[in-house]
Regions:
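Alpha-helical recognition/docking segments in bacterial nutrient-uptake
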Residues: 1-6, 67-184, 245-247, 251
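N-terminal helix-turn-helix DNA-binding module of bacterial transcription factors
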Residues: 1-67
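Short beta-strand segments enriched in small/hydrophobic residues
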Residues: 22-27, 64-79, 179, 191-200
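Conserved residues at the C-terminal ends of beta-strands
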Residues: 26, 132, 154-155, 197, ...
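Alpha-helical structural signal in soluble globular domains
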Residues: 49, 90-94, 143, 207-219
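Glycine- and acidic-residue-enriched helix-capping/strand-helix junction motifs
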Residues: 84, 200-208
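Hydrophobic alpha-helical
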Residues: 129, 134-138, 205-265
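Hydrophobic alpha-helical segments within soluble ligand-binding/sensing domains
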Residues: 162-195, 206, 235-243, 264
């Protein structure tokens, strides 16, 4: 006679068996699947699997927020950056000091990966999720909200959840002014000698670029159209942008505003 105790299913198990995301499984099990417009056939499949595999709500994904796992998540865009790695270290220290366990992951600035990562974290019943620099923070919110997961955006804001961000405009204004004043009166900087490299069409970059333009006009009296090279955050693409600039102008910029430390690295 087999004395082994059969392991009961978790939300993650049901996700694998049904081919549905953990958040979809959670919605079916907590009865909110109709609000999320999940097909009835999908709900029936998941409920059937839950019964067959002895799913019980007091196990892993009481991600329906009735129990606490002690896990706190931090989703970063990348790991290999001083800003984000420093944030991760500080985060881990604060979480551990509260007797909880930090879970740090990256989603590689990929909106689909951000949502998949959030779904996976939900399947492990994390208690909170800090979303840092997400490409699509509202997409992540749409995964977290139905599961009842507390979450907040850091660095880049979303429209559907609370956000904590830096004053990118004022920071860029101060930096642009400092660059200009560094040259003094003996060999003052001309408008066509100061360039901004890096960044893309996100909130932080838009604020920095707006301040860069405004400060150049205010202090230098002009702002040529080609003063901003939005080369994204990739160091390789930024390097190619520098090479293209050099080929076109025969020299490097006299003064340079780097939009992100990722570009500089």
């Amino acid at each position: 006679m087999d004395q082994r105790v059969k392991k009961k299913a978790t939300i993650y198990d049901l996700s694998v068996l049904s081919g549905s995301s953990p958040s979809t499984v959670s919605a079916v099990l907590n009865g909110t699947w109709r609000k999320r417009r999940i097909k009835e056939s999908t709900a029936e499949t998941i409920l059937g699997l839950a019964e067959r595999h002895q799913y019980t709500t007091n196990l892993q994904a009481r991600g329906l927020r009735r129990s606490r796992s002690g896990l706190v998540g931090l989703m970063l865009p990348v790991h290999d950056n001083r800003y984000f790695s420093s944030m991760a270290q500080t985060f881990e220290g604060h979480v551990r000091s509260r007797g909880q366990c930090p879970v740090v992951v990256s989603a590689s600035r990929d909106p689909e990966e951000e949502r998949r990562t959030a779904e996976t974290l939900i399947s492990y019943s994390i208690d909170q999720l800090f979303i840092v620099g997400a490409t699509d923070p509202d997409g992540v919110h749409e995964v977290c909200e139905p599961a009842g997961l507390k979450h907040i955006n850091i660095d880049l804001p979303g429209a559907k959840a609370h956000s904590v961000i830096s004053d990118n405009y004022e920071g860029a204004r101060m930096l642009t002014e400092a660059i200009i004043r560094h040259f003094g009166n003996d060999a003052p900087l001309r408008p066509d000698e100061l360039f901004l490299f890096g960044g893309r069409n996100d909130h932080a970059s838009r604020e920095r670029i707006a301040a860069f333009h405004a400060t150049k006009k205010a202090l230098l009296g002009a702002d040529p159209e080609d003063g901003v090279q939005s080369s994204g955050y990739s160091p390789d693409i930024t390097l190619r942008a520098f090479e293209t600039f050099y080929q076109r102008h025969g020299k490097l910029p006299r003064a340079l505003f780097i939009n992100s430390s990722i570009n500089m690295e």
